[in-house]
Amino acid sequence: MASLTPMMQQYLEIKEQYKDCILFFRLGDFYEMFFSDAEVASRELEITLTGKDCGLEERAPMCGVPFHSADSYIAKLISKGYKVAICEQIEDPALAKGLVKRDVIRIVTPGTVTDSAMLDEKKNNYLMSIYKNKNYYGIACVDLTTGEFLSTHITFGNTFNKLMDEIAKFSPSEIVVNGEFFHDENIKKTLKQRFDVYISGLEDKFFEKEFSIQKVRNYFKDYVIEENAFDLYINASGALLEYLEQTQKVNLSHIQNFNVYRIEEYMILDMATRRNLELTETMREKNRKGSLLWVLDRTMTSMGGRTLRKWIEQPLINLHDIKDRLDAVNEFKERFMIRSEVRELLRAVYDIERLMTKVILGSANCRDLISIKHSIGQVPYIKELLRDLKADLNVLSYNELDTLTDVYEIIDKAIVDDPPVAVKEGGIIKEGFNEEVDRLRSASKDGKKWIAHLESKERERTGIKNLKVGFNKVFGYYIEVTKSYYSQVPDDYIRKQTLANCERYITPELKEIENTVLGAEDRLVELEYQIFVDVRNKVAKEINRLKTTARSLARIDVLCSLAEVADRESYTMPEVTDDDKIEIKDGRHPVVEKIIGQEAFVPNDTYLDMDENQIAIITGPNMAGKSTYMRQVALIVLMAQIGSFVPAKSAKIGIVDRIFTRVGASDDLAAGQSTFMVEMSEVANILGNATSKSLLVLDEIGRGTSTYDGLSIAWAVIEYIGEKIGARTLFATHYHELTELEERIEGIKNYCISVEEKGEDIIFLRKILRGGADNSYGVQVARLAGIPDPVIHRAKEILKKLEDADITRKEKRITRRKQPIEGQIDVFTFNAAQRSYDEVLNELKSLDITTLTPLDAINVLYNLQKKVKG
């Protein structure tokens, strides 16, 4: 260290404190990076890697970016999974004695980004904290850009699966965890691969209960904490607040409301269901287009867009709340003119939530204040329009709409209507607001007039026709003379600079005027900035009123958006009840019909209850529309419970507490699981957590294994749902044998997708009919999919031979009906040898399950199965 230059010593001392960050080290007009940081940044940002003398034998690797365009480079590094520490000069270099003092003023991480250029305006950027205590979890979430703070804990059931569901709900950009969690590489790997999320560790001491209680009390003084309560969310919340303080190093007073929620307060949607129903993004491409959010989002504001996403992610289960929303949507749908005027006013509303965060953090400029002014300027007109509506004014947040006329006037009187971006270059305060500003501005203008007069006078005195007076920040004001007039330069001109085609001079008179002008301008700029900061601070004090109004505007925006969609897409108002019936007339899939057009979509009816129509077994060929139909029913139920109209002629929806889906086949390579293992894990989760109030959507259960294994599993699953759970269920299958269950178990009904045969071809009619299908049409579907003709012909030959070699379908059904299946299916009932049974039983008893890896377990099961089969 002794041989290093003082600046490099300073750099390394600061870097030592932020080892996990790329350090942006301010040097003049650039942020510089050195050593390993420079090598990483030059590669990731595709900028030139150079070197700098640092006092060592070899030059230090170095690269840099201009400070005025640093945001785009920081955004790129954040998107690639890096943290960036911003190290600024914290004293004026002109006044510094020796080395300029520097320090890190902020750490930018994926979960603490506040720059709008790095954010999706209609999506929250959540930072999550997870506290793991044995198999229990505390969770806290914050969106630094809006100040929203949420927390909960998970202390019963399959806690890890519930944790995954909560992470899927919030989709955080970054997760902060305690030591036990951080050092569990398997969990970290699972999180990173499933959610593509950045994991940050924080010392265990910041998760301790006593520390966390004090931290929460410091921020949320009105929240009462019981000292001995087993509230793991307190541990997570305290740690999250500590992490924010460590990274932001500024006042975080915009985080004000401590919202503790119970997972059961809303409809529960697990990770698989969110993915399968494509609520906010498509399953494969992860695109917004093609999701339910894409269909429903006609919001006019960023705040409304984020609120709509939350409604979709967290459907309601309280009947009163659902009806209130539906009534408000209906009111806006019926009152076209009011809706149109409100939406037009909302178009002029900026993102008040995120703008107020910038105000609190001290990063808001004059244009941000003008955006706030324009936004609150719409509120009185919106409030006047809402007064004419009949819907419950509380649902419309009418009483929470504050016209904020005092805040409007604070900004309007002080800040010019079209201010520059920079706040330290003047031109931001209105004329007449401050006498001293007006005086300095006048002095500056008079000085510039004197300079213009001097230029004219000097041209006349010297005879130099193209003489001009110019200015730059290095030399100040100067007189410029081109080469051809050098001989006419007077003796009182003092040369300051020689350029290729001209020379620059000063005179005593010019210097005197310069001192007057620049002195006035410097004082003016400083005074304007002080006034701006004062105005910004006054606005900051009204943050509660502004945030409350922002939430109200967002809610109104969503209600109008849902009404607009209902009107444009011919949706109907559902009748939501507390009973167990789901009755949909001419239901349509909202996304598919949006893509192909309403005229091309074939609507279908649905009827489910807890008596004779509890389980619908749906058969039919691939590509016929079974999956689309089942997803459509689930989406209609979900839409009704967020307060939206639905794509149907009519709909009666008995509230569901959870929607489960097992749709499609996919390997979970991240967890080392096969398609069948993924399927069985999801089915196990459904059977373990579904209630009689749930809606189950199950597609092709058992297809990932052999025919008889798959059929047995599917059969047993249906029995269990019907006899043990009692949930309303849509069950699509290729196992036509399952249609016999209609005669065996009360509450099961068979349905099929209608198909029209034309010669060797088939036409999918997309209509759901009563009864089971008697043909899978596999070869015909293969032809439609583009399988070559020789393969199709050969498939037909093989199919004919297989059908001839087997007993007829009718005989098989008769045989099965003579031998009814009783009770639950036992994996050992097909083995007649008692000796094999004993061997398998003893081997199972001696197994230590806790030491088995997934691969070991599969091998053991394989060997056991061989013994059972003999």
Curated annotation (Swiss-Prot):
Pfam families: MutS_I, MutS_II, MutS_III, MutS_IV, MutS_V. Disulfide bonds: none annotated. CDD domains: ABC_MutS1. GO terms for molecular function: ATP binding; ATP-dependent DNA damage sensor activity; damaged DNA binding; mismatched DNA binding. GO terms for biological process: mismatch repair. One of its GO terms (cellular component) is cytosol. ATP binds at G620, P621, N622, M623, A624, G625, K626, S627. InterPro entries: DNA_mismatch_repair_MutS, DNA_mismatch_repair_MutS-lik_N, DNA_mismatch_repair_MutS/MSH, DNA_mismatch_repair_MutS_C, DNA_mismatch_repair_MutS_clamp, DNA_mismatch_repair_MutS_core, DNA_mismatch_repair_MutS_N, DNA_mismatch_repair_MutS_sf. Keywords: ATP-binding, DNA damage, DNA repair, DNA-binding, Nucleotide-binding. It comes from the Bacteria. This protein is involved in the repair of mismatches in DNA. It is possible that it carries out the mismatch recognition step. This protein has a weak ATPase activity. Belongs to the DNA mismatch repair MutS family. This is DNA mismatch repair protein MutS. The lineage of its organism: Bacteria, Bacillati, Bacillota, Clostridia, Eubacteriales. The gene is mutS.
